Regions:
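Generic secondary-structure boundary/loop-capping signal
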Residues: 11, 22-25, 57, 77-80, ...
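Homeobox/homeodomain signature
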Residues: 4-7, 18-20, 50, 70-73, ...
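Catalytic-core environment of secreted peptidases
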Residues: 44, 48, 60-93, 98
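Alpha-helical scaffold segments in soluble metabolic enzymes
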Residues: 9, 13-14, 40-44, 97
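Generic alpha-helical scaffold signal
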Residues: 8, 31-39, 54-56, 70, ...
Length: 104
């Protein structure tokens, strides 16, 4: 698997959700574009075999069980909401990079 190619594609696909013709992207918390981005990330991580669940405020948790210590957890985080006309890599790069790496 070419991780660089996969990561670039995922960044482009996620960036299209909430992209603004005036420049940048806007995915304010709890808006339709934010929810669509959450669902995109969920579908991508589930396709890689990770377990997913949302908490009561909309945080998406993705988990892959360890092979040696399946009950232990390492947490990492990022965000996909943006400010108005935010940059394309703001937050989502962390989400895309981590989930792509977990799939490798």
């Amino acid at each position: 698997m070419d991780l660089e190619k996969v990561l670039k594609q995922r960044i482009e696909e996620l960036s299209a959700i909430g992209s603004d013709p005036a420049g940048g992207m806007t995915r304010l918390l709890y808006t339709d574009s934010w929810l669509a981005a959450q669902k995109y990330v969920q579908s991508q991580t589930e396709a890689f075999g990770l377990e997913t669940q949302f908490d009561e405020v909309g945080n998406l948790f993705c988990r892959v069980a360890g092979t040696e210590f399946p009950q232990e957890t390492i947490l990492t985080g990022s965000h996909i909401d943006t400010v108005v006309n935010g940059g394309t890599l703001d937050g989502q790069y962390g989400v895309d990079r981590k989930s792509t790496r977990l799939n490798s």
